Structure formats: C-alpha cells, structure tokens
Amino acid sequence: MWTGLGPAVTLALVLVVAWATELKPTAPPIFTGRPFVVAWDVPTQDCGPRHKMPLDPKDMKAFDVQASPNEGFVNQNITIFYRDRLGMYPHFNSVGRSVHGGVPQNGSLWVHLEMLKGHVEHYIRTQEPAGLAVIDWEDWRPVWVRNWQDKDVYRRLSRQLVASHHPDWPPERIVKEAQYEFEFAARQFMLETLRFVKAFRPRHLWGFYLFPDCYNHDYVQNWETYTGRCPDVEVSRNDQLSWLWAESTALFPSVYLEETLASSTHGRNFVSFRVQEALRVADVHHANHALPVYVFTRPTYSRGLTGLSEMDLISTIGESAALGAAGVILWGDAGFTTSNETCRRLKDYLTRSLVPYVVNVSWAAQYCSWAQCHGHGRCVRRDPNAHTFLHLSASSFRLVPSHAPDEPRLRPEGELSWADRNHLQTHFRCQCYLGWGGEQCQWDRRRAAGGASGAWAGSHLTGLLAVAVLAFTWTS
C-alpha cells in the first residue's frame, strides 16, 4: 500500500510520527544552563560571622544557585514572596485576627495591586538576570473544599458574610453563594497578582509555592496499604485550577519528607507521585509547551535537623532529576543556623553526603543531555515508575578533588562508556528545549521555520498531515 509513496510523502509522514510522539518542549534552563539545577536557599550566611563555623566555600560551589530566604537579602536569583512581602494578602493570622480583610472577597484587590510594584521592585531590583520568583501564600486554598482543618475558618467566615447580607436565605443557598464568592475572589487575587508581576518582571519565572499539591499524606493512617498515588479527586481538583496553570510560568511543588518516611519505599513513592502530578499539570495545561518544574525539598527531614539519608537523597533529588524536573530548591529556615553546633552539623553533612550526591546527579543529568539530546534538552525517565536514576556509573567515573578556585570541591573524572550510553538510551528519552525537536533534539525548528519563534511540533502537526495527505493524493 505504501510502496509507491514519493519522498515528499515519506518525509512528511516521518516528521508527523516523530513529532507527534515527542514530549512537549519546555523552557531552556536558566542560571548555569544545566538541564538539572540544584539551588541552595538556606540562611547559612550567619554560620561564619555569628557562630564562627562558616560553610566550606568549595562545597557551596556545588550548587548552581545560592540564596537566602531572609528578609534582608534582595536581588537574588531565587526570590520567595511570603505573605507579608507582596501586596495586601487577605488572611487570618496565628491568633485568628483578620489581616487585610481576612477572606479574599473581603480584601481590596485594587489596593493590593497598587502596592505590588513597590514590593516587587524592592526584592527584584533589576530586569536582568532571569530568576525564579515564588509566591508563598499558604493560608487559604483557592478550591473551596480544600480549606479543611485550620483553614476551615475561611469557609466559616465566608458563610457568615453571606448570611449577614441575606439573613432570610436557607443554609444550602448560603453555602453555595459563599463558595462562589470565595472562589471567585481567590481566583482574582491570584490571577491578577500573577499578571502584574509577570508584566513587571517578565524575565523571571513566576508561580505559587506548593502548587500543584497532591494531598498524598495518608501514610499516617494507612501505612500498610500506602501507595503514594495522588487521590483521583485531587487530580480532578488540580484540573479545576487550569486558570492558574495557564498564567504561571513555572511550577513549584514541595516534597518535604517527614522522618516517619525515612529510608523507606513509602518515602520514594510519596515524592515520586507528587513530582509526577506536577509534571502532568505542567504538560496538559499548555498547548505548545510544558512549564518547567522546580521541586522544593529540604536537606533534612521536616521538623528537625537530621540530614537526609543516602536513600532519601536519591528519593528526593534523584527522583526529581530522573522524572524530568528542571531542578530542586533546597530550602531551610533560621533553625539551621541557631548555634555553632547546628552549623557544624550542617557543614559536616554537606561535605560527607549532600555535596558528593549533588555533584554526581548534576553531572549525570548533564552527560545524559549531551549524549542523548545534543545538549538541547533534558533526559526524562521513559517509565516514570521505574527504579532507574541519572547517576554517574561507578565503572566509568569517579569524583576527584578539584583545585581550581572557581570549581566545587569535587568534580567527575571519566567518560561515558558504550554500556552507559545504551543504558541511558534504554531508560531515558529527551524533552527538548523550546526551539528544538527530534528524538534527540537534533532539529533546530527556529532555523527550519525561517527564524520564527520555536514552537512545539503540535503547532505544525496539522500542516504536516495536510502535506502528507496531499502528497499521497498526488501519488495515488
């Protein structure tokens, strides 16, 4: 049937099949240009002057980005806007007092937007260079039903507001109206905030911390049967936030591990499905590209200063890299640097465990990008649930001391063997950066399009199919 096809048909069909099976392209990496970024966002600058225990500068060079979440640091590559640093975010404080109206429908969006410029300008003072900008609003959630436990105050006060305006309404009508008013106002606050800050600092990648969430914490109640999978209802609720994903330019899920999950398969599953859900959202809610995903994690377990085990470094940083995240952000608060002892423990952990692993996985992701994707994409695990990672092969590489002043303490020595390349090709595929295509990101679509901006193959697919059909008609 197909033997009589001419070269035009053959080429068109090859392009259609190849482009249709590719992953959507994503934004090229920022900062160092590495396919997988590891950022350090812990206020460890106090360890030297205050506690006489500075961290090793050579260790810190293992991180692509260094920042601090503390108030006094501005113009950083990573900026986190907590609720008191960006506009007038309506919420209830820790003692239940209303701040800026309490519930979003009681806040002033206009006044909030008026204040944004000054706040953004204070923390991000220049347009260049590009960076990550994370809005951390955790007091309420824009989906009504997700405001459970201590967040139920937002539903309760929303119902009271409606009841005060309509005392004759039945309870079910009050609830329905309260939900509508809350969700509409929450959406407006989040959307208009994103639109403003994106227009004001367009080179930064903007999104909300902990969005999307997976709500897969049921290991506490169901340890024996825990799978880590996101409940179907929560996946559906994430899809209700399509308006948020459409306006975001990056996603920032969180995979903080409780010590209950330490060195367990449950810990890996908890992380894996949260990252997979973020990558799903990043992919399905944009027609022509996938949003970059930067995963927040901690160098220690939640609510403590015990460093992650080797297994859990793999389950957090390694799993994120293998699944195709753009990077991880290692976050910590002032509790990491309260004394000489806490700084010493952190310094020892960095030298002994964290830095060697970060160097390993960062370079493994880079070598895979070079070998598999021509340096124009990142490697993504073919089977998301497979137990395979982007690690340097012990038979081909070793980490050796680096004496160059501008390099990390350790660097890889060796090269990929044919067995390494076969392993990568078997277990990983490429996700190309915008403007590149092909199974190995070998096609420069910008050049093929005559200088037009690089868009995903999906935008060309209809045209290619038309070419194929037309050419087949000519040869029939």
UniProtKB/Swiss-Prot annotation:
Any one annotated GO CC term: endocytic vesicle
| Positions of the propeptide segment | 452-476
Task: Please list the residues annotated as glycosylated.
Answer: 77, 106, 340, 360
The lineage, from the top, is:
Eukaryota, Metazoa, Chordata, Craniata, Vertebrata
Q: Cite any additional comment in the entry.
A: Acts as a receptor for the Jaagsiekte sheep retrovirus (JSRV), which induces ovine pulmonary adenocarcinoma. A possible mechanism is that binding to JSRV envelope proteins may liberate the oncogenic factor MST1R that is normally negatively regulated by HYAL2, leading to oncogenic transformation.
Residue ranges constituting the EGF-like domain according to the UniProt record: 364-442
- Please name the catalytic residues of this protein: 138
Complexes and interactors: Interacts with MST1R.
Provide the GO biological process annotations: carbohydrate metabolic process; cartilage development; cellular response to fibroblast growth factor stimulus; cellular response to interleukin-1; cellular response to transforming growth factor beta stimulus; cellular response to tumor necrosis factor; cellular response to UV-B; defense response to virus
Q: What InterPro entries does the record point to? A: Aldolase_TIM (IPR013785), Glycoside_hydrolase_SF (IPR017853), Hyaluronidase (IPR018155)
Protein name per the record: Hyaluronidase-2
The organism is Ovis aries
